[in-house]
């Protein structure tokens, strides 16, 4: 792939300890847990396993850094932005290493890991520009008063990161949190802690003061739950399943009513009308379903195709799926890697079995690929109905469900008939049809004649059980600030 430096196979593991107060340290218990390569299920290394006592230490480090009068609290906003720019530059310097490390940790193709890192750098630079622009305002109130607002940092934030985009999701949360002046504990997914720990070393190198960013690897049921329920953490940002997100919100409410932002599950529809360019729509729907091995909250797993082109679409979709290059993620032409672990592999295979049992037609795939790792063949089903369980629940795997529809009103109702509302897409050359569809969709993002494009400048998030609030763009700054109103009585107001 042009412009991408070659990967490093089996990159050196430079950091496997907990990062607190700008130091890599052993966990309090001195326990470690294994991290595996999902391509072959071979152990990569052992990482120090954080527990509640390590979270407490990280919280105290955050509180010390956030104390009034500290270098972090007194730092000029322009200087804070400079540190974020510096962190982006360091990531750019080490981009090939970080992409290689992420590929080993997740199994995703190296070229995709590389693009993830490019996007991380863009996000850091975007929010670096916001550091000295997230300002309050003066308000012209009645009477002899001077009224204005301040946008102040929330304080100590807990960032709970998923395994599907480890560095990308960390950056989506960390960059705006830092731009607003917060301190944070990052808890990466237990399966994929390595790039987060390496990023911690770059945070120190960039010049962020001790305690501002702390990274504690560990298990969700221990560290994640404790962050959600911790009395001294002011905000939690979580990306993961709706089921776990509800537990996070319960813990947040029962503890100190901490603020929550949630990016949760999805079951996104992609609608193809008969007037579109068919090969292009097939390609876009293919990538929507299989990108990142289907391990995306915004995966376009429900493909609705107009009845006039349905059979031909299915035929071409099967051709695309069967030709998708599956295998070694370090090869530049590989498009499809393994699922993250055995648990997820088994869940996907069970969904496939249930789909066949309910009468959906398996057109290709549906089996394990190879005899090592957790590879699932790109899988296509036709003759799927909305009532089937795998049409309603998030599979989080490489399974494309192709359904037939007759007209606009019908497909709008079917698209919206779900518990989720992450994203949707329409492929059509009719501008009036596209406007009707985009306005009717009950979801956070609608793509027209494209799929899976998001930008640092634009908000991303879901309706309904797909989440709360937005990440990226100016909208996410609200999630990491408190608005304070200040009112002075003055001798005389003048215009």
UniProtKB/Swiss-Prot annotation:
GO molecular function: oxidoreductase activity, acting on the aldehyde or oxo group of donors, NAD or NADP as acceptor; structural constituent of eye lens
Membrane-spanning segments: none
InterPro entries reported in the protein's UniProt record: Ald_DH/histidinol_DH, Ald_DH_C, Ald_DH_N, Aldehyde_DH_dom
Pfam families: Aldedh
Keyword Electron transport annotated: no
Organ and tissue specificity: Lens.
Keywords (A to Z) from UniProt: Eye lens protein
Gene3D superfamilies from the UniProt entry: Aldehyde Dehydrogenase, Chain A, domain 1 (3.40.605.10), Aldehyde Dehydrogenase, Chain A, domain 2 (3.40.309.10)
Family membership noted in the UniProt record: Belongs to the aldehyde dehydrogenase family.
Function as written in the Swiss-Prot or TrEMBL entry: Omega-crystallins are structural components of squids and octopi eye lens. Contains relatively little if any DHAL activity.
Protein name (Swiss-Prot/TrEMBL): Omega-crystallin
